[in-house]
Amino acid sequence: MVDEIIKSMQSKMDKTVDALKKDFGTIRTGKANPMMVEDVRVDYYGTLTPLNQLGKIACPEPRVILITPFEKGMLKDIEKAIFAASLGLTPNNDGSSIRINIPELTGERRKELAKVVKQKAEEKKVAIRNIRRDANDELKKHQSEMSQDEVKGHQDKIQKITDSYIAKLGDLEKEKEKEITTL
């Protein structure tokens, strides 16, 4: 029973860490990253479809994203969708693929992005703490079936797991901030 609570908690925390990685992937750092555009929704025969399902997204150079659609007829729609997504990126349609040159970040923009990184990391840390609270609440429901020492031991275990996930988020945050602030 306690193992199930901990397993469920770790699963939720893993998803939270993955969500932060995904959030960070969408933040423009001056380097090309396919994650910047892969979730852009394109009108594909009346259905809004993620760009990564309509073509191959690659980064042939450090500051270039190359999108090669599976259907050449989709080039105009993909171009429109990238403009509509307000990513601050300018797609160049060469007739067979779309190239996006990633401009250098200004010092001011780097500071803004560093703040966004801190904010997103803090949101996920709060989510991790909420997951911990839920796990402790679940543990309290089964308190009558255990001794106080067992309950305390399980709470300590939950806290150690929480601390390790908070540290993971902190590492991801530092890594992304370094990526943004490095010229």
UniProtKB/Swiss-Prot annotation:
Q: Which keywords are on file for this protein?
A: Cytoplasm, Protein biosynthesis
Q: Which InterPro entries match?
A: Ribosome_recyc_fac, Ribosome_recyc_fac_dom, RRF_sf
Please provide, alphabetically and separated by semicolons, the GO molecular function terms listed in this UniProt record. Answer: ribosomal large subunit binding
- Pfam families this protein is in? RRF (PF01765)
Localization of this protein: Cytoplasm
Record carries keyword RNA-binding: no
A Gene Ontology CC term for this entry?
cytoplasm
Superkingdom assignment: Bacteria
Task: Report the function annotation for this chain.
Answer: Responsible for the release of ribosomes from messenger RNA at the termination of protein biosynthesis. May increase the efficiency of translation by recycling ribosomes from one round of translation to another.
Protein name per its UniProtKB record: Ribosome-recycling factor
Q: Which organism is it from?
A: Leptospira biflexa serovar Patoc (strain Patoc 1 / ATCC 23582 / Paris)
Q: What is the lineage of its organism?
A: Bacteria, Pseudomonadati, Spirochaetota, Spirochaetia, Leptospirales
